[in-house]
Amino acid sequence: MTRWRPAAVLFDRDGTLVRDVPYNDDPALVEPVPGAREALDRLRAAGVPIGVVTNQSGVAAGLIRPDRLRAVNARVEELLGPFDVWRVCPHGERDGCACRKPRPGLVRQAARALGVPPGECVVIGDIGRDVEAARAAGARGILVPTPQTLPEEIAAAAEVAADLAEAVALACRPDARPPRVAGGRGTGRGSRIGRTPR
């Protein structure tokens, strides 16, 4: 019997794969979260395509130059290995684009680039808009909370994992639903005050 696997797993960048540094334009500040490389390598070994879907509103705000964004993303790949697709929304909150999470555009674009149906993808992220974008695209969303994750985002998530290793294991086991972990890598007590828009 063939083991089920997702058509692709798409990750948020900041706060999920690497430490969240607000409006980071410095590759030297890129720091993977614990276990990120191992979780990604597990998917690579299984032949599952992986990608990044990330909001980068600092570009629209003039805080991140496009070339610096590319340099930061290149550093992410240097530390975590290659991704099969990157999709970045450079727009601001009020720009009205279709790609900015929680809208489904980034997820749909990434799935299209990989040649897979969005409904067979899994999206892993650390805040509500990541799993909301997954839901809007018809994909499966898994939340990995950090201190920036709001309690209501945890409560609203259909699936919650303590860390990336658990999220990847859950992504590859659609029939298994382990107990929800309130907090994960954080306390789940994040506040809107001080949370930098992405």
Locations of the language-model features?
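Non-catalytic pre-domain segments flanking phosphatase-related domains
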Residues: 1-13, 169-198
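Acidic, Mg2+-coordinating phosphoryl-transfer loop and its flanking beta/alpha structural elements
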Residues: 122-159
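Conserved Lys-Pro-Asp/Glu-containing loop-to-beta segment of HAD-superfamily phosphomonoesterases
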Residues: 98-128
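A short acidic, helix-capping loop that chelates divalent metal ions and anchors anionic groups
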Residues: 21, 26, 58-63, 92-97, ...
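Active-site neighborhood of HAD-like aspartate-dependent phosphohydrolases
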Residues: 1-51
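Structural recognition of alpha->loop->beta junctions
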Residues: 72-88, 152-173
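Substrate-recognition element of Asp-dependent hydrolases with the DxDx(T/V) motif
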Residues: 36, 40-73, 83-95, 134
